[in-house]
Curated annotation (Swiss-Prot):
Function: Dol-P-Man:Man(5)GlcNAc(2)-PP-Dol alpha-1,3-mannosyltransferase that operates in the biosynthetic pathway of dolichol-linked oligosaccharides, the glycan precursors employed in protein asparagine (N)-glycosylation. The assembly of dolichol-linked oligosaccharides begins on the cytosolic side of the endoplasmic reticulum membrane and finishes in its lumen. The sequential addition of sugars to dolichol pyrophosphate produces dolichol-linked oligosaccharides containing fourteen sugars, including two GlcNAcs, nine mannoses and three glucoses.
Cellular component, GO annotation: endoplasmic reticulum; endoplasmic reticulum membrane
Origin: domain of life: Eukaryota
Gene for this chain: ALG3
Localisation: Endoplasmic reticulum membrane
Listed name of the protein: Dol-P-Man:Man(5)GlcNAc(2)-PP-Dol alpha-1,3-mannosyltransferase
Bilayer-crossing regions: 389-409, 431-451, 468-488, 550-570
Pathway: Protein modification; protein glycosylation
Annotated source species: Phaeosphaeria nodorum (strain SN15 / ATCC MYA-4574 / FGSC 10173) (Glume blotch fungus)
Catalysed reaction, written as an equation: an alpha-D-Man-(1->2)-alpha-D-Man-(1->2)-alpha-D-Man-(1->3)-[alpha-D-Man-(1->6)]-beta-D-Man-(1->4)-beta-D-GlcNAc-(1->4)-alpha-D-GlcNAc-diphospho-di-trans,poly-cis-dolichol + a di-trans,poly-cis-dolichyl beta-D-mannosyl phosphate = an alpha-D-Man-(1->2)-alpha-D-Man-(1->2)-alpha-D-Man-(1->3)-[alpha-D-Man-(1->3)-alpha-D-Man-(1->6)]-beta-D-Man-(1->4)-beta-D-GlcNAc-(1->4)-alpha-D-GlcNAc-diphospho-di-trans,poly-cis-dolichol + a di-trans,poly-cis-dolichyl phosphate + H(+)
Amino acid sequence: MSKLSPALKQLINAAHSRPGPVPAPPRIQAVYQRIQEEATERKLGRPSWLGISTAATMTMNSPESMIALYNSTSASRPENESVQIAEFMREIGLKCIGFNGIPRTINMLNAFRASLPPTIASSLNTTPTRSPSPQNILDTNTRGRALWDAIYRPLETKLIDKLGDAHPDLPVFIINQEYGGLFTDPPGKPGAKVGRVTTSLVAITCLRAQQGVGPQVLSHVFGLRKGWEDGTWKEEPEAGSEEAIRWLVSDEGCTWVLEKVDELVEALGGGAGTLSPAIDEKPKELTTTKTMSLINRVRDLATNDEHTRWMIPLLLVVDAALCGVVIEKIPYTEIDWTTYMQHIALIIKGERDYTKITGSTGPLVYPGAHVWIYKQLFKITDEGRDIQRAQYIFALVYLGTLALVFQCYRKARVPPYVFPLLILSKRLHSIFLLRCFNDCFAVLGLFAALFCYQRDQWHVGSFLFATGLNVKMSLLLPLPAMGVLMIMKLGSREAMTHAMIIFQTTVLFGYPFRKAAFSYFGRAFELSRQFTYKWTVNWRFVSEETFLSKPFALGLLSVHVTLLITFFLTRWIKPSKRTPKQFLKIIMPQAEPRDQDTMALRITPNLHT
């Protein structure tokens, strides 16, 4: 009777009886890294994001992913900090018993310790901290009841009665053993501690990952919010700053938590919670490179933004080769290059009056940054005669701009299928490589500014934007949207500082023309200038008479203003959670609004683009 028959062993270990440990998918570290980056942007501390990732991995039963999470978190950390990380993850795993059960937790924690580097494993705490005794049993039960009441008030007593109807010992076990003995840390406990905020995040994560327990998830979402309301979040300052926790308990923050858990479940289990399949169901295939169907591979390649890590350099190399082919095989188109060089030649001779600086296709109508850039090109290209050298310089400008655009799109989580489209634009290659327009440097300045804004480098970004604006005035077009975002992100007073940076940079680039300042600003920033029909592309379908008419110009201006107002009302001010009238009041307030920090947290990289 001590041995089992082969048939019985086979039945016990059958794949359909219960899914086994989940191998680490190839992209799981990238998912962990993204969650960490997003949490850090929101000023959430390590306990918050590491607690979510650890709890989801424990629930999905993936020991390999657990050690991958540890490795990515502890990389380049000193040994003592790596020990703290391992202790914390182990403590999170222990709390998962209350949601995932004992057997799975045993297997996961054993596998986790066995995979740790020997020096880390040997440094882990080996002394129990939750041993019951006559001296601490009352305190443990009191802690459990206090946590229960804090989470479920004002329904705490009704829930106890309801649980007691199911089984009289059920509320006793849950409150005393789970909430008191497990979910709360004993006083004076050495090593890793898991506070109220992180415990709620663990509960939400485990239950969400299991699926099928929506009411319990809802209860712990409310429990997380009550931790903010009663101030117990302050007992765990490592979880995040005040503004970060305020955001975390908001609708937006809770949505973020649930979405991150869903991403982990999708990555680790193909979207199925591991505790939910029916007994006769075969587990779904893991979304790994080896097992995915061709359709799933294509879908993953098109929508999983982690692929942009390798896609961006590949596309840049391909486009660099394409640029070479375009320059060598397609004739250069002369439109403004010669005129630019004629302008620069006059400036080098000492002319500073914009009304006297003219060339083959017209007068100089661009600001000082344009002059400075093309003065350098004048020197490098033998006074503009070496066109091919200029084309290769513009190819470098194009590739640099494209790299910035890629990074801005990647930061905004644009899906990968969009990226190849960026290198297929015939018009972009024409503008940069075949015509050498100054639009190239203006766009470079714009996307360099967006790159900085997305990374909270606002002062540098405003200088770069001002530089692009002083190449070509077309950069005034995105300025209204940028102003609204700055007010919400930085506050109206700091937004005024950035307006001054843009103004002062404009004055700086105009300094060489200070003796003819009126002609400089009149020509370089002339808003009433009428464009020549010959050079239009987008309005070629209308007649020249219509294009040059005043009603047509006023009509376009009206449409533009209408679109600005529409975007202002329907999209730009959304993060402020204000009506248009209320928003206008914060533009010039006597003091910053109370919710400025919360409003600022809603300005994310995807809004910048």
